[in-house]
Regions:
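Membrane topogenic/interface segments and analogous intrinsically disordered interaction regions
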Residues: 1-269
Length: 269
């Protein structure tokens, strides 16, 4: 005899005796305390990784900067003979420190993503069925893999296109003086954002495997998701020309639709 638990309009069938072992009522205050504890662990881990990486922040800045912009540390600041070098300029005393913090925080953020998934699992574990626990645990290493793939996607495909567009868009009008904080902030924002964006397939598959929703329901609401993705992309991609938000939104929609297509092809959900 199987027990069926309704979750989000779908049924999750579990054999008798496989119900959540640790499921018990907890006061709201204890739930909030547990949630804060789990988030605290994630933030502390992010801070520790950022602190370890901080001494190497200048190397990270130089590596990222000259991966997408012309020039090198040996020719900056630019002279008349190297006027084509896109050297970083500091316009206030805190700009360099803030850029270093952003470089270190990017590393901490990428490492913290799978830890966040794991701590979410620990928070929800008492109410999960054994099969749901297995799905969630399998998602932890996959989260790190997807985060690294997202960073790589942004590094090799998105950022080069965006900065080539910026350079070509501005050259006929003015000589660009690249502000370190703003320009490097855009780099780290997009790298970190794509690490997060590439979690979309994981979240979709987890939600379906755990019976929270179905592929058919997600497909029927796709236009709402597309609109949400576009809104988030334009909110977190500070580019008044619209180039970066369009690329980010297209990537999010592509990941969402690709996941639904894969689930349909495999017959899951």
């Amino acid at each position: 005899m199987a027990e069926s638990t309704e979750t989000g309009g779908t049924a999750v069938n579990e054999p008798a005796g496989s119900q959540p072992i640790d499921d018990s009522e907890m006061p709201l205050a204890e739930h909030i305390e547990e949630m804060i504890k789990r988030l605290g662990i994630v933030l502390v881990a992010m801070g520790v990784v950022s602190g370890v990486v901080f001494p190497f922040a200048d190397d990270i800045i130089n590596f990222l900067w000259y991966s997408f912009l012309p020039g090198s540390p040996t020719v900056c600041p630019a002279t008349a003979d190297q006027a084509s070098a896109a050297c970083p300029y500091v316009y206030d005393p805190l700009s360099l420190v803030l850029a270093r913090l952003k470089a270190a925080s990017l590393a901490g953020f990428v490492v913290a993503l799978p830890l966040f998934v794991y701590q979410t699992y620990r928070f929800m574990r008492p109410g999960l069925y054994p099969t749901e626990r297995r799905y969630y645990l399998a998602a932890v290493p996959m989260s790190l893999v997807l985060a690294l793939v997202g960073v790589g996607f942004a590094f090799f495909l998105i950022l080069p296109v965006i900065f080539q567009y910026f350079l070509g868009y501005s050259k006929p009008v003015a000589e660009i003086a690249f502000a370190l904080e703003d320009t490097f902030g855009l780099m780290t924002l997009l790298l970190g954002f794509f690490a997060l964006v590439f979690q979309i397939p994981l979240f979709v598959m987890l939600a379906i495997m755990m019976g929270i929703t179905t592929r058919a329901w997600l497909a029927s609401k796709r236009l709402y998701f597309w609109g949400g993705f576009a809104g988030v992309a334009f909110l977190f991609s500070p580019d008044p020309t619209g180039m970066a938000p369009v690329i980010v939104a297209a990537t999010m929609i592509g990941l969402f639709e690709g996941t639904l297509l894969l689930l349909r092809w495999t017959g899951r959900g």
